[in-house]
Amino acid sequence: MTKLNFKVFLLAMSFLSMHAFAETESKSTDAYSVCVDETIQELGLGNINNAVVDICSHKTKTLYAKQIVQVLDQIKKQSQEYQQPERYSDIMKSQQLWKSFVEQECRNAGAYIGSPMYEYCPMQKYGERLEQLQEYLN
C-alpha cells in the first residue's frame, strides 16, 4: 500500500508543479493547459482527473507530432539550400533513435509512476523535441 501511496503522491506533485509553472512553460504546455481547462468545463468537472489528462495529453502530442513533421520538412529544405544533405540525414537518424527512447522512457514512467504517464510523458517529450528541432533551424 505504501508503494501505491508514493506513486499517487508523485503523480499529484507532477500535476501540481505543472499547473504552478504554467505561465513560465513554453507553448507546449500552453496547448495542454488550454485543453485541460476546456475539457474540465465541457465535462462539467470540478478538477482534473485521469480521463482529462489522457484526452489532453493525446490531443497535444498529436499537435506536436504534426509540428515536428513541419519542422523536419523545413530542416530538409534548409539542408538542401545549404547543400548539406548529411545534416538532414543525421537529424533523421537521431529522430528515429529519439522515438525509440521516448517509447521506452514513457513505458517506464507509466509502469513506475502511474497510468496517466503513458500519455502525459510522450506529450512532454514531443514538446521538448519540437523546441529542440526548432533550434536547429536558427
Can you annotate each of these PLM segments?
Residues 1-9:
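Bacterial N-terminal signal peptides that target proteins for export
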Residues 22-138:
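N-terminal alpha-helical modules
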Residues 9-15:
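Hydrophobic helical h-region of N-terminal Sec-dependent signal peptides
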Residues 17-19:
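N-terminal signal peptide c-region/cleavage motif recognized by signal peptidases
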